[in-house]
Amino acid sequence: MVKLGFVIAEFNRDLTFMMEKLAEEHAAFLGADVSCKVMVPGSFDMPLAIKTLLQKDDIDAVVTIGCVIEGDTEHDEIVVQNAARKIADLSLEFGKPVALGIAGPGMTRMQAEDRIDYGKNAVEAAVKMVKRLKEIQ
């Protein structure tokens, strides 16, 4: 059984809550176990929590769940670009999958509501990567 850790952003919680629930349901459907959940203020705050989970022996992969909505400045782009870069770096550093389930940047609230399946898709990617990496090790 694949053991997942979830790192969930509290910012735009109404949306990340729906993303989280879909992700949990899909994990159960795939036979994966969500062993640990960590809530962080926002997507930019995820890397430290991800690193902590990746250090645990009982976590095979981490799924990120966040939603960054466009504002009047380029803040959303900076947040997502930096978070995504660090997330990829951590995956490579620890040799474990970290799936990007962050919706955004450059999206309106309405678009965000249409993209709540990003968490589900991240679970799918994480589980597939764990299984495929085990095949080649």
From Swiss-Prot:
**Keywords tagged on the record:** Riboflavin biosynthesis, Transferase
According to its UniProt record, the EC number is: 2.5.1.78
Record Pfam families: DMRL_synthase
InterPro entries documented for this protein = LS, LS/RS, LS/RS_sf
Q: Catalytic residues per the record?
A: H75 (proton donor)
Q: Where does (2S)-2-hydroxy-3-oxobutyl phosphate bind?
A: D72, T73, R115
State the CDD domains in the record. Answer: Lumazine_synthase_archaeal
Pathway assigned to this chain's UniProt record: Cofactor biosynthesis; riboflavin biosynthesis; riboflavin from 2-hydroxy-3-oxobutyl phosphate and 5-amino-6-(D-ribitylamino)uracil: step 1/2
Specify which residues bind 5-amino-6-(D-ribitylamino)uracil according to the UniProt entry for this protein.
F11, S43, F44, D45, C67, V68, I69, L100
**Assembly and interaction partners:** Forms an icosahedral capsid composed of 60 subunits, arranged as a dodecamer of pentamers.
Role description? Catalyzes the formation of 6,7-dimethyl-8-ribityllumazine by condensation of 5-amino-6-(D-ribitylamino)uracil with 3,4-dihydroxy-2-butanone 4-phosphate. This is the penultimate step in the biosynthesis of riboflavin.
The protein's name: 6,7-dimethyl-8-ribityllumazine synthase
Species this protein is from: Methanococcus maripaludis (strain C5 / ATCC BAA-1333)
